[in-house]
Every structure is written in structure tokens, then in C-alpha cells.
């Protein structure tokens, strides 16, 4: 009997958040066609949030379908807010192409979009994942439920 194929295990570093989707595009390469986009993730206090840009490559057929369905709304400059999980974070630098800061370099984080928790177009929730990661409402705090044998 042949030896069973060993399943490769990985250490995962994932980023979970919400942010605005923009610049959806399909890219053709030697590995086939895939979808890329930009997520400007919200970070900081809810009354004075700042943004962190992520240049993402969409992973998986279901996520690709969901992001491609947002193309029209994004092209028409509607606000598309998504709940997401990213993986495979890498630092990069990009150059601003337009505006008063055109030509200036800015930091960027590249990542793979591995899960879409929800999609909101304007004020309308248009998609919620069947097993969405529940994000507590801003300002709410769940009671702490400690294990009796906590460290």
C-alpha cells in the first residue's frame, strides 16, 4: 500500500474588518484570470475613523462571484461596504496616479480576500454570509465569560 498523502499545515495570520470596496478589476496572467480590488478598511474610533488601504486579490470562486457582482455599483461610485477576512498580508508601496498628491509614494498592504461576511450597498444590506463572523455593534461590550480554569 502507498503512503497516505501528507496534508500540509500552515500558520494563518488573518485580518478581519469592514471597509469600502473600490477599483474592482479582472487581471489576466499566466495563471488564468482573477479579480483584484482595493479595500479601504475603517480603523480607529467610530466618530473619527481613519482608513487603511489593502490591495486585494480575491480567493475562491464564491468570493470572486460576490466581488464581481459589486462591479456596477463601484463603477457608478456608490458606497459599497463589506465585512471581510484577509490573509497572506504583505507590505508594498504604490504611487498616487491622480489628485493633488499625484506622483507621491504611499504604503500599501497586499492581501488575499478569503471571506466576505456581508456586503452593504448604500444603506441596503445586499448580502450576508450564512456563517458570518459577528462583529459587535460599536460601543457595545459583551459580558466576559471566563473559563473556570482561566490563567
Language model features by range: what are they?
Residues 1-151:
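Single-stranded nucleic acid-binding surfaces, predominantly the OB-fold ssDNA-binding core
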